Regions:
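Positively charged n-region of N-terminal signal peptides that target proteins for export
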Residues: 1-7
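Bacterial N-terminal signal peptides
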Residues: 7-19
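Beta-lactam-recognizing serine transpeptidase/beta-lactamase-like catalytic domain environment
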Residues: 24, 33, 55-56, 61-88, ...
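Conserved, well-ordered alpha-helix/loop/beta-strand core segments that scaffold catalytic motifs
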Residues: 26-55
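Generic structural signal for hydrophobic residues
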Residues: 42, 98, 173-174, 355
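Active/ligand-binding-proximal structured segments within catalytic/core domains
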Residues: 91-100
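Short, gly/Ser/Thr-rich active-site loops of penicillin-recognizing serine hydrolases
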Residues: 262-269, 351-363
Length: 363
């Protein structure tokens, strides 16, 4: 009951309270006499889909940054908005950001291949993976979500002194590209309580790893290790990819006859990876839906692009999904994060598919 009350308050509280502001940054003063961007039917569906679970569902209109739904379930404290206030490992959903970045650097190409036989060994360390054919190229590595491929690709990027003579420069450039896609910092949503996640840079790794190299931090390649994101950031990343490289600050207010959305919220942010790299990423996300980890959301009426994640956790793993639809002229980007939900393909992915179908097809 507390969860239901919280999500209802998320929709109506902005009308009941005089002014919200993000006090720490002092960025926004949000008046209350303007309508919300939330789609009531979508919000209701997302609420029902998360019933009895702990986690969040977020949907964004990629063309505007408007929040279409934002649901947070918390079994312990319903006052915490997990969509913007909780930082998690993104798991394999992070591989799409890796792909766009490493492609633009020239560290990989669409033809790059790595072997995987239920994982791989390096320096006595085993990276596990599920069974699939081997070797894989880039599009297949996204579609099949191969852990071995992404760890080897990231390791080789970090250790490639021909590409980057100084490893710190390599990691700092990587960090900058991730930041340009809205990762590792708060996005500036017009709600209080947003946290920024974590994308490590060279200074952070120097402090925490003491003599790091590609092998010791290769976990970052598959979205594990120190990387942390919020569900809102994952949804925004899906919007970045849907737009082939740009995004708008996610926001929950829209214009009315008496109030205009803060111009800060309508600025178009351009990410650093190339448009061509995003097209290849989208091809991989389509492969995931056609014959990879996202087959549960194939739809005969429109083309869906998706990426699953299974985020390692001390207890049961978290189930993660992010995606958008349609492939051309996208209307909705979605992220789903279910704590202790297991495989992303089994739970978060089908939930995300239902959210997209409701918005596009109205059912």
């Amino acid at each position: 009951m507390r969860q239901l009350i919280y999500n209802l308050l998320l929709v109506i509280s902005l009308v009941l309270i005089n002014t919200f502001s993000i006090q720490a940054q002092g960025v926004y003063q949000l008046p209350t006499d303007r309508p919300l961007t939330v789609d009531a039917k979508l919000q209701n569906l997302a609420e029902r889909l998360l019933n009895g679970k702990q986690g969040s569902i977020v949907a964004i209109d990629p063309s505007t940054g408007e929040i279409l739904c934002m649901v947070s379930h918390n079994k312990v404290d319903a006052s915490v908005n997990r969509a913007i206030s909780m930082e998690y490992s993104p798991g394999s959903t992070f591989k799409v950001a890796q792909a766009a970045t490493l492609l633009t650097f020239g560290a990989i190409t669409p033809e790059t291949q790595y072997p995987c036989h239920k994982g791989f060994w390096t320096n006595g360390i085993h990276i596990g993976c599920h069974e699939h054919h081997s070797p894989l190229d880039l599009v297949q590595a996204i579609g099949q979500s191969c852990n071995a491929w992404w760890c080897q690709a990231f390791r080789d990027f970090v250790d490639d002194r021909a590409l980057y003579p100084v490893k710190a420069t390599a990691i700092n450039d990587w960090h900058s590209f991730m930041a340009s896609m809205g990762l590792g910092h708060s996005l500036g949503i017009d709600l209080p309580g947003e946290v920024g996640g974590l994308i490590p840079d060279a200074a952070y790794l120097d402090f925490t790893h003491h003599g790091w190299n590609g092998t010791t931090i290769m976990w970052l390649g598959m979205g594990q290790g120190e990387v942390r994101t919020t569900p809102l950031q994952l949804c925004n990343l899906a919007a970045v990819i849907a737009n082939r490289g740009y995004w708008y600050t996610p926001h929950i207010h829209k214009n009315s006859s008496t109030q205009v959305v803060d111009s800060v919220l309508t600025v178009r942010h351009q990410s650093r990876p190339s448009k061509e790299s995003f097209e290849i990423v989208i091809e991989g996300m389509r492969a995931a839906v056609i014959n990879g980890t996202c087959t549960a959301i194939r739809n005969p009426h429109y083309k869906v692009c998706g990426k699953t994640g299974t985020a390692q956790n001390e207890g049961h793993d978290h189930s993660v999904f992010m995606g958008f639809a349609p492939e051309k002229h996208p209307r909705i980007a979605v992220s789903v994060y279910v704590e202790n939900g297991g495989w992303g393909a089994d739970l978060a992915c089908p939930l995300g598919g239902l959210v997209m179908e409701q918005y596009i097809m109205g059912k």
